[in-house]
Amino acid sequence: MVMILIKLEIDRRAYNSIKNFSRLVYTKAIKNRGDLPKKEEIVTLTYNGKFVAKALYNPKSVILKILTTEDEEIDYDFFYKRIFNAKIYRENILNYKNTYRWIYAEGDELPTIIFDKYNELGAMQLMSKLIEKEYLKDIVDILFELSDLETIYVKRGKKGERIRDKIFGDKNKFETVIKEGDAKFKVNVRGHKTGFFLDQRENRLYLEKFIKEGDRVLDICCYTGGFSVHAAIRGAEVVGVDLSKKALKLAEENIELNNIPKDRYEFIEGNAFEVMKEMIEDKEKFDVVILDPPAFTQTEDDIKNALRAYASLNYLGIKLAKRIFVTCSCSHHVDKEMFKRTVISSAFRAKKELIMIDYKGQAPDHPISIGNKNLEYLKCIFFYVKN
């Protein structure tokens, strides 16, 4: 158990924000900043000397993450209640059964923890050394107790940090096959992030209604073939492009898993911008074009460069699209309106009129509670291309 010794007094604005369900507090809202701990700790937040919340503080961040607005112990029962409630929401409200994002950080009042369930395999991203040291065993025990999980694979630290991952349960089981509608996918929990992008689940299923047999479909930044497989099982010929040879190998395995003939798919390893430029020069066209790039910015300071990259990518995609154009952004710092404006300006430049069919976001197992705009990151717009 972590002893909570430090009390930090917050200003009125932060207090009102917490009362309106925000789960983040900026250090600039702390009145007694000189009392901020020198290491990662759980702290008590007060307003006019009265208890407001318990929060996780990391000196490497300008944000404190709210753990609870109740004056309760952070212990086994604390984690059990939240993990159980998260499971009930996915299974009883959303009707997800075997595969889903079980824990979505602040969306489930469990900051720094991301956990995906793929049948009997679980994959966790853990971004707090304190939570790992003090509570990881409890969290893992609870996840096993509440499910049919056989293996939990824990990815620790941030990108670039050389920290060995942890494995609980069956240490030789890393791969499973999940179902998504009529599609099947191999998932390896040792892959990028937690192994598969569950946030796009509903958007991949939605894509199917726009696919006609014999369509040519271009899937840019296809990763392990999520959109490609859904297009292919509806009779399309698919071309997928990605920089990662490892991801493309899994994409090909996923296509084969769904019994798609070899003459109906092609995967190209390469830079999306360069590949699309060559396709335009060769006067290629596709009935459906999907753009699903990685985040072009991780910080607010780099938004202008990110928007330029989105503008270029969308311009190229629109030039290649004949009927349906699907474009996505997973950059937290590029909001919905900003992204839409960028796509529209790219359409003007390409001299193509687009009609917006739908503006979608992340799957509902990535919950966005009111007062927490930071939890909303995925944008996915479906357009009809007028000819």
From Swiss-Prot:
One GO cellular component term: cytoplasm
Gene Ontology MF terms in the entry: methyltransferase activity; RNA binding
Single Gene Ontology BP annotation: rRNA processing
Enzyme nomenclature, EC number: 2.1.1.-
Major subcellular location class: cytoplasm
Keywords: Cytoplasm, Methyltransferase, RNA-binding, rRNA processing, S-adenosyl-L-methionine, Transferase
PROSITE patterns in the record: PUA
Superkingdom: Archaea
Pfam family name, one: Methyltrans_SAM
Signal peptide residues on this chain, from the entry's feature table: none
Cellular compartments annotated: Cytoplasm
Family: Belongs to the methyltransferase superfamily. RlmI family.
Protein name: Putative ribosomal RNA large subunit methyltransferase MJ1649
Origin species: Methanocaldococcus jannaschii (strain ATCC 43067 / DSM 2661 / JAL-1 / JCM 10045 / NBRC 100440)
Highest classification ranks of the organism: Archaea, Methanobacteriati, Methanobacteriota, Methanomada group, Methanococci
